[in-house]
């Protein structure tokens, strides 16, 4: 119910390309967000998605995040995870286009799940490095199968509670954090904690993407806090995700745009 009212509020205040006076945002919106073409990687990842949806296997799941609205228990079918936890094709492919557009060398993903979104993040360029975090070893094992099936060798999976693994992984980075997708814990405090940890490794050209910014009142509060952070110069609310930029040479701006 919260998401329904949140979407109605979003629809009333959001717009499209008409009236966009920022050349950067206009180009991003028309070339990436509203892009209607296809890429070769789409078919391969979606074929793997169908394999997971058809799977009869069950695994024991440990969830360190806010859980799901489905109320599913500890033992879960792989097909159910693919159906309810994996990002839908439209959103996962948007993330692919964002990475393809900005060409980051180092990509961080908080929340691997079965590896479908990770695969999209990695498939744009085999030369860039994707580091992804998954709390549950059994889920991570399925993700590894996904990467092997798609011949993706540029992905490193960090297993364990992100609260314990994120800081040391960031400390060991030998390059700036160019792109980060936050999908690991849909609660206020952890979201802001992960954001602040990653801030120390960003550049002015870094892109942070936050998933499910209207998922709950808690996540909306976190998003508002991120928007007003002094280092954040530009944010784009696409309802399902929020884009964060740190571009210094422009005034602070916020946009709400329909996908």
Describe each model-derived feature in a short phrase:
Residues 1-181, 185-207, 213-259:
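A short alpha-helical cap/connector motif
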């Amino acid at each position: 119910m919260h998401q329904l009212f949140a979407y109605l509020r979003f629809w009333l205040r959001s717009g499209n390309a008409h009236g966009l006076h920022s050349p950067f945002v206009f180009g991003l919106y028309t070339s990436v967000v509203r892009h209607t073409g296809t890429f070769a990687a789409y078919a391969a990842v979606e074929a793997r998605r169908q394999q997971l949806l058809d799977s009869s296997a069950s695994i024991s799941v440990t969830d360190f995040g806010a859980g799901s609205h489905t109320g599913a228990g500890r033992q879960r079918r792989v097909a159910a995870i693919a159906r309810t936890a994996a990002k839908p094709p439209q959103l996962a492919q948007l993330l692919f286009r964002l990475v393809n557009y900005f060409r980051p060398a180092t990509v961080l993903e908080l929340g691997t799940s079965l590896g479908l979104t990770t695969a999209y993040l990695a498939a744009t360029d085999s030369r860039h490095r994707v580091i992804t975090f998954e709390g549950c070893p059994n889920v991570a094992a399925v993700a590894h199968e996904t990467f092997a099936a798609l011949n993706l060798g540029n992905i490193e999976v960090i297993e364990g509670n992100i609260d314990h693994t994120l800081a040391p992984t960031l400390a060991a980075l030998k390059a700036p954090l160019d792109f980060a997708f936050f999908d690991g814990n849909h609660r206020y405090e952890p979201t802001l904690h992960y954001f602040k940890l990653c801030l120390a490794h960003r550049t002015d050209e870094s892109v942070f993407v936050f998933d499910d910014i209207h998922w709950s009142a808690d996540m909306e509060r976190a998003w508002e806090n991120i928007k007003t952070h002094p280092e954040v110069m530009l944010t784009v609310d696409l309802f399902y995700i929020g884009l964060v930029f740190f571009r210094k040479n422009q005034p602070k701006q916020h946009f709400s745009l329909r996908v």
